[in-house]
Regions:
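Short terminal alpha-helical segments
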Residues: 1-27, 79, 86
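Aromatic-residue detector
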Residues: 10-15, 42, 60, 72-75
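Amphipathic alpha-helical interaction modules
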Residues: 15-57
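Amphipathic alpha-helical binding modules
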Residues: 60-93
């Protein structure tokens, strides 16, 4: 299964350990651009279909998780923080 492109770019731009800024993505959400809407749709798709593996995430975000359950708990926390006004993500890799 392929990881959607816009989701991959959001990981590189906002969630990579060298540039960890989910608050910047959250700020961009307020502008509701077409790009942000694509990211949200693709983030929804990733959470539903679960194509991101621990190895993929480690390669693209430079962050390791022990298992996919922990990874997807973290991704759900990021989604809630960015798109639903949830708290800052607390799950760590």
């Amino acid at each position: 299964m392929t990881v959607p492109y816009e989701f991959m770019m959001a990981v590189h731009l906002f969630l990579h350990t060298d540039n960890y800024q989910p608050h910047e993505l959250k700020a961009a959400v307020a502008q509701r651009s077409e790009w942000i809407e694509r990211i949200q749709r693709q983030f929804d798709e990733v959470l539903q279909t679960r194509p991101v593996t621990v190895d993929w995430y480690a390669e693209h975000a430079n962050e390791g998780f022990d298992d996919e359950e922990t990874l997807y708990r973290y991704l759900n926390e990021v989604y809630d923080y960015v798109f639903r006004d949830g708290p800052w993500p607390v799950t760590e890799g």
